[in-house]
Amino acid sequence: PFDHRSTFEKAGFEDISRVKQIIYEAFKKSLDTVENGAILIDEEYGDEILRDAKDKGYTTLLTTEKSGQEDFVFEYGDDFAVHIEKYNPDFAKVLIKVETEISDLTKTNLKKLNDYCHSTSLKLLIEIVSGGNLDLILKTISELQHAGIDPDVWKVEGMENEFAYEQIVQEAR
């Protein structure tokens, strides 16, 4: 629920951090144990939430991409590692939009993030947004793996049937 920076901004919310804090408070009340909860949020509007969630023992995922971009570019450019280390999340997360193929810029930045995560034992989650195009998801996973990009988690959109998920799992192995 927290990975929608541009949506909040376009909706004209004046105090996005406050809205996210309200959502976070409801999130905490809805869980019986911290082991069942994970927070995915950005640094800009979620600084206090990230710190509190980490202190309370929730799994934390920090967004790394600049919201609303066609290609994956780091929110904080070459200083991305400094911003990740500031929060010490369990996962670095990146969303990539794929309509036909992955741009060289996206691949280069994904490789940087992948190598950083592997060198620091930080887990990496890559979310592929393709409009639910199974063939494109499979092609993207294959292409990224051949480029040496190996996240801990591939996050994909909902698929039509179980067979589609089986194909994704097979490709990701």
Region annotations inferred by a language model:
Residues 24-27, 47, 80-84, 110-114, ...:
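Generic structural signal for well-ordered alpha-helices
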Residues 26-37, 87-88, 117-122, 144-152:
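A structural motif corresponding to the C-terminal end of an alpha-helix
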Residues 45-51, 72-76, 98-118, 158-172:
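Active-site-adjacent beta->alpha loops and helix N-cap segments on the catalytic face
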Residues 38-43, 90-106, 140-164:
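Catalytic beta/alpha-barrel core
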Residues 57-60, 120-124, 171-173:
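Short beta-strand/loop segments at the ligand-binding rim of alpha/beta enzyme cores
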Residues 1-101:
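Alpha/beta catalytic barrel-like cores
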Residues 63, 88-97, 125-131, 153-157, ...:
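Core alpha/beta catalytic barrel or barrel-like domain that forms the active/cofactor pocket
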Residues 96-99, 106-149:
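Conserved anion-binding
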